[in-house]
């Protein structure tokens, strides 16, 4: 390998010609497009799954959510950061014990 035989760098505005070996490789590759039509998939949910997909409010305490929204809007919501940190640390410790 000789330093004298390297190709000079060209500015970004100029386009370098492709190597003929690159063009030959591209013509040999099979096309990614398929000529066969793609069929759709039909999904049938069971009654239990369909019920779970429906919005419900049984697991949400709507009154508590509204109280929290009002406290946030008025700037009166206070958070016990120590309690949050303790719960987070307990959660991490439990995860480390189980693994």
Swiss-Prot record:
Disulfide bonds: none
Residue ranges of the region described as Disordered: 1-42
Pfam families: FlgM
Keywords, alphabetical: Bacterial flagellum biogenesis, Repressor, Transcription, Transcription regulation
Any one GO BP annotation for this protein: bacterial-type flagellum organization
Polar residues bias (residue ranges): 13-39
Keyword Plastid: no
Function: Responsible for the coupling of flagellin expression to flagellar assembly by preventing expression of the flagellin genes when a component of the middle class of proteins is defective. It negatively regulates flagellar genes by inhibiting the activity of FliA by directly binding to FliA.
UniProt family annotation: Belongs to the FlgM family.
Entry protein name: Negative regulator of flagellin synthesis
Organism of provenance: Yersinia enterocolitica
